[in-house]
Amino acid sequence: MINISLLGAGRIGKMHAQNIISNPQCNLVSVYDVNKDNANIVANLCNAKVEDSPEEAINNQEVQAVFIASTTTTHIKYIILSAKAGKPTLCEKPIDLDIDKVNNCYNEIKNLNVPIQIGFNRRFDE
């Protein structure tokens, strides 16, 4: 069983939450969103805990992996926090709108040896 924390409980976050709980090998442990109402809705649907900060969600000792489905401007911060905590991470696209910030993020985490995946669902569309 993989215990997952979800950062972001908006439209895409809800979709990820449903996918997580429909997989018998996964368990949604905690949810964080700046909008507490959204976090509570998703957490209640999934029997998960609402965390008060992204740091609490990522550093929760039960959590083995992190899904990032928050606003784009938070992605780099959350990727770095997750990588430094040693948690494999799936982050929704885009990483950021500024390529220099993306490169800085890469340089900060590249030697941490933590899997980070970006969710590009239409990589090969024409």
What are the roles of these predicted feature ranges?
Residues 16, 48-108:
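Beta-loop-alpha module in the N-terminal Rossmann-like domain of NAD(P)-dependent dehydrogenases
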Residues 96-126:
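A contiguous active-site-proximal alpha/beta segment in oxidoreductase catalytic domains
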Residues 26, 87, 114-115:
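Short, well-ordered coil/turn segments that N-cap beta-strands
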Residues 1-46:
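N-terminal Rossmann-like dinucleotide-binding module
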Residues 11, 37-38, 73-74, 97, ...:
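Short alpha-helical
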Residues 23-24, 60-61, 125:
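Acidic-histidine catalytic/liganding microenvironments
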Residues 29, 51, 117:
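General small-molecule cofactor/ligand-binding pocket signal
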Residues 10, 32, 72, 95, ...:
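Short loop or secondary-structure boundary microenvironments that flank
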